[in-house]
C-alpha cells in the first residue's frame, strides 16, 4: 500500500504543512484566538481566516521560546489542521519538525499524539535547520553549511558537516519576530497611540514597513531631518476591517483625514530589525546574528571553517526584512579572515517556507529513518534518541580532519540519516 507523505514544519507563528506532491505548503496559524467582538467563539488554527475583525485579538500559543509547552493546545490545533486536509492518517506518514525532540530534558509527546491519537502509520522527526543542511549536502552536494534560522521565537545559528550537526556550534539568540513585534507595540504605544492589544495589526505593520539598515548611524542622521524632509518617515493607516483589511503605507506628505487612525514610523522602521544584530539595544546580553555566525564557525575545527563560511543559508520569517542578507554578509565579512571566501546564499526564494521545500526534495530523493507504529510500541523514546544522536557529531571527532571525503567515510549511517 502506498502511503501519503505529509511534510509538517511546526513553527511558532505559522505551521507549514502539505503533502509531498503539493506545489507549496499551506501556512496555518499555530495559535488559538479569541476576538473581542466574538463573545461565543474561539478561532483555532486556519479558522482565524473567518475572523472579520482582528482588533484586540487574544492569543493562546502552544509554543513559548521555541518549544511546545502546552501539548493539549498543540493537539487541538493539529486536530483542526489535519481535519481540514484531504488525507487519512491511517494511510499516511508524517515528517515533523520538532524542537522538543532536540532537547531530551524537555517533555516531548508528539510521537505519542501522532501515533496513538491521530493514528499515523509512520513518523519522522527532525528540525528545520537539519532539513536545510541535509538538502544542501545531498541535493546541492555541499559538504558544509551554516544555517541561520531567524524565526518567531528565536534566532539560531548551527554548523553542519555532511548534513550532520556539529553539536558545539549551536548558538541561540533570544530575539525573533515575537520580540520585535512586542517592542514595536511598546514604542508606538509610548510615543503615539495605544496599540498594546493590537498584536495582529502591529505585526503586519512591522512586515510592511521595517527594513534592515546597512549603516545604522547614517540612517539615524537621516531620521533626524525635519518632518517634511525626512524620507524615512512613513504613515501607516490602520485597517478598519470593514472596507480595508490590512494597513496602508503612505508618504507623510500626502493629505490624510485625521479622523482615520494612523501612526507614523520613522526611526522605528530600522531600529526594530536592528535588535537582531544588536540585542543589547533592548538589554539582552547576547551577541547579534553576525557575531553568532562567527562564533558558530569558530566552534568547529579549523580545517572546516573556510568551507562553512562559503555556504551560509538564511531561513525563517524574521530574515524577510529587506536588507537582512546584505547586512549579515557585510558584517560577517568584516569579522572573517581575509583569506576566507564568503557566500550568504541568495537562492532562498522564501525564507519562511524554505525548510519545507527542502524536506519535500529530500523525501523525494533520499531514504530517511521512519519510525513505524510497531517499532514505536516496542522501543518508543529510546528509538527516537538513537536516531537523534546519529545526526550529531562532536567537534572533537572532527579534529585532524584533512579533507571532507575522509570525514564522509567516518559519518555513521549517513545514507540512512535525515
Curated annotation (Swiss-Prot):
The keyword Cytoplasm applies. It is found in: Cytoplasm, Cytoskeleton. InterPro entries: Actin, ATPase_NBD. The keyword Metal-binding does not apply. SMART domains: ACTIN (SM00268). Belongs to the actin family. ARP6 subfamily. This is Actin-like protein C08B11.6. It comes from Caenorhabditis elegans.
Amino acid at each position: 500500500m502506498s502511503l501519503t507523505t505529509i511534510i509538517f514544519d511546526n513553527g511558532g507563528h505559522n505551521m507549514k504543512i502539505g503533502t509531498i506532491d503539493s506545489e507549496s505548503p499551506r501556512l496555518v496559524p499555530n495559535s488559538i484566538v479569541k476576538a473581542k467582538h466574538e463573545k461565543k467563539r474561539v478561532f483555532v488554527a486556519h479558522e482565524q481566516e473567518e475572523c472579520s475583525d482582528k482588533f484586540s485579538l487574544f492569543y493562546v500559543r502552544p509554543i513559548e521560546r521555541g518549544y511546545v509547552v502546552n501539548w493539549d493546545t498543540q493537539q487541538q490545533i493539529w486536530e483542526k489542521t489535519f481535519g481540514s486536509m484531504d488525507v487519512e492518517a491511517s494511510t499516511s506518514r508524517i515528517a515533523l519538525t520538532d524542537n522538543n525532540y532536540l532537547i531530551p530534558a524537555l517533555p516531548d509527546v508528539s510521537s505519542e499524539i501522532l501515533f496513538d491519537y491521530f493514528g499515523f502509520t509512520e513518523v519522522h522527526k527532525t528540525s528545520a535547520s537539519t532539513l536545510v543542511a541535509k538538502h544542501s549536502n545531498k541535493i546541492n552536494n555541499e559538504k558544509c553549511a551554516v544555517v541561520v534560522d531567524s524565526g518567531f521565537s528565536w534566532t539560531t545559528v548551527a554548523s553542519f558537516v555532511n548534513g550532520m550537526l556539529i553539536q558545539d556550534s549551536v548558538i541561540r539568540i533570544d530575539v525573533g519576530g515575537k520580540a520585535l513585534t512586542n517592542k514595536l507595540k511598546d514604542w508606538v504605544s509610548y510615543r503615539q497611540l495605544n496599540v498594546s492589544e493590537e498584536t495582529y495589526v502591529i505585526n503586519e505593520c512591522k512586515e510592511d514597513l521595517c527594513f534592515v539598515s546597512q549603516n545604522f548611524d547614517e540612517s539615524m542622521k537621516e531620521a533626524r531631518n525635519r518632518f517634511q524632509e525626512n524620507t524615512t518617515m512613513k504613515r501607516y493607516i490602520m485597517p478598519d476591517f470593514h472596507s480595508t483589511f490590512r494597513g496602508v503605507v503612505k508618504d507623510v506628505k500626502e493629505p490624510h483625514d485625521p479622523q482615520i487612525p494612523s501612526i507614523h514610523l520613522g526611526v522605528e522602521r530600522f531600529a526594530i530589525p536592528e535588535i537582531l544584530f544588536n540585542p543589547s539595544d533592548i538589554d539582552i546580553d547576547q551577541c547579534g546574528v553576525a557575531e553568532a555566525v562567527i562564533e558558530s564557525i569558530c566552534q568547529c575545527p579549523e580545517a572546516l571553517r573556510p568551507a562553512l563560511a562559503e555556504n551560509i543559508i538564511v531561513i525563517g520569517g524574521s530574515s524577510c526584512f529587506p536588507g537582512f542578507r546584505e547586512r549579515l554578509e557585510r558584517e560577517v565579512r568584516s569579522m572573517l579572515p581575509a583569506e576566507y571566501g564568503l557566500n550568504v546564499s541568495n537562492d532562498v526564494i522564501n525564507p519562511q517556507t524554505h525548510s519545507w521545500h527542502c524536506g519535500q526534495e529530500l523525501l523525494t530523493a533520499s531514504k530517511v529513518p521512519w519510525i513505524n507504529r510497531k517499532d514505536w510500541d516496542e522501543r518508543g523514546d529510546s528509538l527516537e534518541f538513537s536516531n537523534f544522536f546519529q545526526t550529531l557529531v562532536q567537534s572533537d571527532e572532527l579534529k585532524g580532519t584533512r579533507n571532507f571525503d575522509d570525514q564522509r567515510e567516518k559519518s555513521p549511517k549517513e545514507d540512512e540519516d535525515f
